[in-house]
Amino acid sequence: MRVFPIPLLSHVRGLIRQGPSSRFYVVPALARTNLTISHSEQVKEGTFDYKALELNDIGVLRVLNSMKDDPYLALSFLKRIEGNVTLPSVQAYATVIRIVCGWGLDKKLDTFLFELVRRGDEGRGFSVMDLLKAIGEMEQSLVLLIRVSTALVKAYANLDMFDEAIDIFFRAYYSLGRAPDIKALNFLISRMIASGRSDMVVGFFWEIERLGLDADAHTYVLVVQALWRNDDKEELEKLLSRLLISETRNPCVFYLNFIEGLCLNQMTDIAYFLLQPLRDANILVDKSDLGIAYRKVVRGLCYEMRIEDAESVVLDMEKHGIDPDVYVYSAIIEGHRKNMNIPKAVDVFNKMLKKRKRINCVIVSSILQCYCQMGNFSEAYDLFKEFRETNISLDRVCYNVAFDALGKLGKVEEAIELFREMTGKGIAPDVINYTTLIGGCCLQGKCSDAFDLMIEMDGTGKTPDIVIYNVLAGGLATNGLAQEAFETLKMMENRGVKPTYVTHNMVIEGLIDAGELDKAEAFYESLEHKSRENDASMVKGFCAAGCLDHAFERFIRLEFPLPKSVYFTLFTSLCAEKDYISKAQDLLDRMWKLGVEPEKSMYGKLIGAWCRVNNVRKAREFFEILVTKKIVPDLFTYTIMINTYCRLNEPKQAYALFEDMKRRDVKPDVVTYSVLLNSDPELDMKREMEAFDVIPDVVYYTIMINRYCHLNDLKKVYALFKDMKRREIVPDVVTYTVLLKNKPERNLSREMKAFDVKPDVFYYTVLIDWQCKIGDLGEAKRIFDQMIESGVDPDAAPYTALIACCCKMGYLKEAKMIFDRMIESGVKPDVVPYTALIAGCCRNGFVLKAVKLVKEMLEKGIKPTKASLSAVHYAKLKAKGLR
């Protein structure tokens, strides 16, 4: 085994920078005073003796005043003497505040006053009003007094003492003639909203309006947010109306900021509502300003994942002569991508190309990601190459998507070459680029290349982050390189990056995926601090590896709830295997015991699993458990139970369940009705479906067509076809197969071609079988060859039809050739083609060949039919002349 160059990485020094230490003074209480230097110097040197100084108000003030050039020292001194029995006077605090304000240390002032306010009057020995009075007596600077008022408003707001904060705000205005800073106002309002006091905001704001105090766009956004939360539409309309008729210093800037604030706070509807009168009243006159406002609204709607509404706004833009720019299209495309509506994103992009709109690198990266999300990695890379040949400036994000696509395609070498091309163009790679390439290398088992890239990145001075280490460690584990993965974890710690539970999980799941179950268990046991996430990862890893016994055993040992995704993964895996369905039910019982409510879909999955193995009793038992727990089964659960009863030819039970679901207000859908009609074509469900507003689909029509074909009522069949066309429901290949099976003489190929419906193996089988039944073997073989030429792979059924036809017509040699051809094509013959061939051999006197075929069936574990055994038996008797 190759020794990978981890030691080469470990000697590369980490780029952990030492942050600058903040200035801090230690003032020991037992030091003796040095009389030859000043108080402030003694405090700095740590030689100041607090006991030697009479800590009266004058002495403290004298020391503090000597520290006016050093606010940090003043704060440290005050904090130190606060530990004495006698609290510092209000003048001492006022002096420190004046010093801190004088140096413009607003954050220090905020923290200092927050702690002071939190103590309360008893803890301080004075009231806040006393403090403000003391500051006012010392200082006449309006700026300083406003700063103190601002900090006090924020302190009270932080402590949710809103009445006191409002009181300070208005006291400052009435006594100083100026209100505290606008940021303090906005902070106070935002704290009120966060604390659920939106009602308080409205009254406070109207008083500010009455006094004519300044409010910026952000203030209005917050007030709108409060009204929105209160669902006070009347007040909201009143506010917006007043806003539209009010005069502002710079209306364009104000309204653009206001619209942006509304959009950022997920109130885009209000922003759009406001934009329209602004546009119509020519307040936003310039088209560029209108374009910016529309762009903000579109991006806001996309952020709220309301992409269709965003597209409607784009149409409104175009209607008013505003051309959507690249940023608008970028938001729409990215919104569709995030919403997983990939075809729509690509469609918007194609429309951009047709309109010859400018494309930027953001749109390129979004579109490339769309193709990757669809799994079309080859198309993504081809498109990247097309963009590369244009004059669009591609950035490292676009290249990164291309690296990822090539990695998924197994073309790691090509990805690295592309990486070299990117750096050659002067585009500096970031850690994400290296992470993608390293992940691609590990995915393809090229771990040495992953190490080389890691070393190269270190050489560029870029510090590896936790993500890249996780990818590397997980990749090594997945490739079975357990020791190298463990060494990577050690290297992380040596370089100051602490592995998290995510790191450990990637190693655990990687080792399990590589089949190293013992090493995964050992690694888990070696963890000093095991987290619940690690336990969850063990369960998920065993599920992914198909080790369901290990997964369930570990799960059942845990006495605490796991993330729902883990339950779902294990549950789904258990339901998929018939021998583990009972354990899936045990899992649900365990969830209920731990107080975890299962997803409703899990109930349907379990019932579906029991129904799949035809154990309706178990399915019904669990169904009854849901009823006793007052859990109403969902539509899927009811439908699958009804389908199972229908499949087992128990229509009464199926219909009883159907009536039960309606009683419980579970509305049947077209699938439910289709299942019932498929079981009992005599049911008349048309009126009921109309009452429930259930629109028929192609499956429903196919079932109905099949029903009337059996009744030989072609008039109703054609009426159904006509109704399908009226509803614009295109018949599928199953519909045509049903029609062909009942009326094989009808030529449907032209109509299918018109609807672009391509025949499948079942359709071809019906055609072949019909030609065989009328004795036209040549036409049957021609259709068979046509099926293969069209790219449809035959299964056993068309082969069997041809074999039976050949045997019936006495062409035994040709029948055997078709049988051998079937085996050569990879189709395993079942009992039906064997039975046809045996019957042909017996009918034509080839008894030994028939006996040989029976033995061959038994060797392959295929049980011969009674008819085959009887045919061989009578053929033997006939051959012996005993009949």
Curated annotation (Swiss-Prot):
It comes from the Eukaryota. The keyword Repeat applies. Disulfide bonds: none annotated. Keywords: Repeat. PPR repeats lie at residues 145-180, 181-215, 216-251, 253-285, 290-324, 325-359, 360-394, 395-429, 430-464, 465-499, 500-534, 537-561, 563-598, 599-633, 634-668, 697-731, 760-794, 795-829, 830-864. GO terms for biological process: embryo development ending in seed dormancy. Belongs to the PPR family. P subfamily. This is Putative pentatricopeptide repeat-containing protein At1g13800. It comes from Arabidopsis thaliana.
